[in-house]
Amino acid sequence: MTAAAPTDVCIIISAKNAADTIARAVASALAEPEAAEVVVIDDGSTDDSASVARAADDGTGRLNVVRFEENRGPAAARNHAIAISHSPLIGVLDADDFFFPGRLGQLLSQDGWDFIADNIAFIDAAQAATAHGRIDRFAPTPRLIDLVGFVEGNISRRGVRRGEIGFLKPLMRRAFLDQHGLRYNETLRLGEDYDLYARALANGARYKIIHSCGYAAVVRGNSLSGSHRTIDLKRLYEADRAILAGSRLSSDAEAAVRRHERHIRDRYELRHFLDLKNQQGFGRAFGYALTHPAALPAIIGGILADKTERFRPSGSPAPVALGGKGDVRYLLETLAVDQPQK
């Protein structure tokens, strides 16, 4: 085996029933000269995801497709890909999504990081073929984000855009992950990225963000990443509690993680109440609320907020699948400092 160069990147793609999009994702990763490995994990698909991924091979010997017989979740799929790869840098690409040309080179032009991420463009599936020509060009404007800023950037607030910093798709240094024993938490089916990045920051990771846009996130109404179970919320706030119990955090960082834990726990309490109402009737749900008074503010506040949210006008451009009119939306839009190229 040829020794890996310091800038060699392994791109990991976890796929579940992604036959319609996986070829585009694989092709965009293989088009990046810095991608020394592209590892696709077919996570128990019932369609032809694995064979479609193999058909996208460019013959350079960089593509490795592995199929799980049963679905194990994206965290397990990514951990397996990390275990069977060797490149010193690791990046994740969702099977619905794709890279814009030159993404990895732009990221690797920066120094002084353990994790580095760029802007994300949210687009509708119908825009994918022409999206690169429509993307605004932003100056990189690099900055480091600490644990407090990262966690606060994952807390949604009514009337403003939902917290999305955890959606960023950073390159990660394998050496840092190995040094601190960091891997994805396989009990999580929601927020596994947030949890890994938060634990890395708690261990002193230098997480750099640049504002140039190299990642296209294709938004679909039936996307697996857009749905979750009530139990997934419970496991996510329990992951926050594990960070609090297992890390020596500053007072500001501890307070931020506690706010995120409470935010996710409130979402869980509301969802659990609604599940009981739908499955066992209002009486059972009302009884739960009465016997769990600590959950009452989350339940009452959540119901009232949901009823008023439908009357709130959209305040920013968005793809159709996100309730907009087909516009491109940027995760780091408010930090844009450059004008679109005409």
UniProtKB/Swiss-Prot annotation:
InterPro entries: Glyco_trans_2-like, Glycosyltransf_2, Nucleotide-diphossugar_trans. One of its GO terms (cellular component) is cytoplasm. Pathway: Glycan metabolism; exopolysaccharide biosynthesis. It comes from the Bacteria. It is found in: Cytoplasm. The keyword NADP does not apply. Its EC number is 2.4.-.-. GO terms for molecular function: glycosyltransferase activity. Its main location: cytoplasm. The keyword Hydrolase does not apply. Keywords: Cytoplasm, Exopolysaccharide synthesis, Glycosyltransferase, Plasmid, Transferase. It is an enzyme of class 2 (transferase). Pfam families: Glycos_transf_2. GO terms for biological process: polysaccharide biosynthetic process. PANTHER family: GLYCOSYLTRANSFERASE (PTHR43685), GLYCOSYLTRANSFERASE TAGX-RELATED (PTHR43685:SF11). Belongs to the glycosyltransferase 2 family. Glycosyltransferase required for the synthesis of succinoglycan (EPS I). Needed for the addition of the sixth sugar (glucose), catalyzes the formation of a beta-1,6 linkage between the fifth and sixth sugar. This is Succinoglycan biosynthesis protein ExoU. The gene is exoU.
